[in-house]
Amino acid sequence: MSDRPPLPPFDRESALTKVQAAEDAWNTRDPERVAGAYTVDSAWRNRDAFFTGRPAIIEFLTAKWNRELDYALRKNLWAFGGNRIAVRFQYESHDGRGQWWRSYGNELWEFDEHGLMRRREASINDVAIAESERRIFGPRPAGERGIEFPLQ
């Protein structure tokens, strides 16, 4: 198995790098690419859904991005220690009827010794927004990396 740096234990710089890498991958909306950052038996809780393994992750993300159109995400480091990282995030997307949503969430991540995520727990709340209220347009520009995203 090849390593996926940075590897635990995390310091502030390596945790920030891991968070930005996750944001970048999720903004591709490529389920296969995203799933590659997780162990083959990674355990997930996403809202009220529980599942395990890369095939289930790919299935979940495929359905998610078929439903959450023009998805764009921002993640910020919240805390880290040892092989764990906590993040807060916001993403925006619209549904098939054209209603825009901003989703606020927190994630708890646990990594194996190779830098692959073996556990992900996500709690998420959705808020309907007007298209004119959007703040997230595609992947984060290079000049905005490392900048804390505002709560509101």
Predicted feature residues:
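A beta-strand edge to alpha-helix "cap/lid" segment located at domain peripheries
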Residues: 1-10, 59-152
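Short, low-complexity N-terminal intrinsically disordered segments enriched in polar/charged residues
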Residues: 1-40, 147-152
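A solvent-exposed, acidic/Ser-Thr-rich amphipathic alpha-helical stretch
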Residues: 14-16, 31-85
